[in-house]
């Protein structure tokens, strides 16, 4: 269920969101990053992903989000669970008047580049970087760099 903007703003202001992030690796061991068009993390390079909607199963969210973010609908079984992560932002989708808090379920995926049909709704452009390159780049958001940093492990379960 997608909410009206004012209802979604009330949710973001008051609660954490649940989202899925996709750590997509190609055959050369490079990671897919998109340059975000929207807040939060606008302008930064970030792994693809998105939020889980109310009453949406993880299986349905995974399929919907891989279609929306990668241009190919994949089943949950295509991903390898990579842990629970916490993302905090000082801004939100509509501005700077309140923060955004995500609880993120990370999933690693190996996908052939030729299978992807990368959309332009959330990211203005895309690139592939090695883990070493993305760790060294200040233009890659810290929350995406954390997936490869030994100093920022997933939340223990």
UniProtKB/Swiss-Prot annotation:
Enzyme category, top tier:
hydrolase
Q: Which residues bind substrate?
A: 2-3, 8, 36
Residues bound to Mg(2+) are 49, 69, 122
Where the record annotates domain Nudix hydrolase, the positions are 3-153
Ranges spanned by the short sequence motif Nudix box, renumbered to the chain = 50-71
The record's keywords, sorted A to Z, are: Hydrolase, Magnesium, Metal-binding
So what does this thing catalyse?
Answer: GDP-alpha-D-mannose + H2O = D-mannose + GDP + H(+)
Q: Which cofactor does it need?
A: Mg(2+)
Query: A Pfam family in this protein?
Result: NUDIX
Q: How is the cofactor bound?
A: Binds 1 Mg(2+) ion per subunit.
Q: Which SUPFAM superfamilies match?
A: Nudix
InterPro entries (UniProt xref):
GDPMH, GDPMH_Gmm, NUDIX_hydrolase-like_dom_sf, NUDIX_hydrolase_CS, NUDIX_hydrolase_dom
Q: Which GO terms describe its molecular function?
A: GDP-mannose mannosyl hydrolase activity; magnesium ion binding; manganese ion binding
KW Metal-binding (keyword) present: yes
What is the top-level taxon of the source organism? Bacteria
Q: What is its EC number?
A: 3.6.1.-
Q: How does it assemble?
A: Homodimer.
Read off the NCBIfam families from this record: PRK15434.1
PANTHER family reported in the protein's UniProt record: GDP-MANNOSE MANNOSYL HYDROLASE (PTHR43046:SF12)
Q: List the HAMAP family.
A: GDPMH_gmm
| Similarity remark | Belongs to the Nudix hydrolase family.
What this chain does, per the entry, is described as: Hydrolyzes GDP-mannose.
Supply the name of the protein: GDP-mannose mannosyl hydrolase
């Amino acid at each position: 269920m997608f909410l009206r903007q004012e209802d979604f703003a009330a949710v973001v202001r008051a609660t954490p969101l649940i989202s899925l992030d996709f750590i997509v690796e190609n055959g050369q061991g490079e990671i897919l990053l998109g340059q975000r068009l929207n807040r939060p993390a606008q302008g930064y390079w970030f792994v693809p992903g998105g939020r889980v909607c109310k009453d949406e199963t993880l299986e349905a969210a995974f399929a919907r989000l891989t279609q929306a973010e990668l241009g190919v609908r994949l089943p949950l079984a295509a991903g390898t669970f990579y842990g629970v992560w916490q993302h905090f932002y000082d801004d939100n989708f509509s501005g700077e008047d309140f923060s955004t808090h995500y609880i993120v379920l990370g999933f690693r995926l190996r996908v052939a580049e030729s299978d992807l049909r990368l959309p332009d709704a959330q990211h203005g452009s895309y690139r592939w970087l090695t883990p070493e390159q993305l760790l060294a780049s200040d233009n890659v958001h810290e929350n995406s760099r954390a997936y490869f940093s030994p100093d920022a492990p997933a939340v223990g379960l």
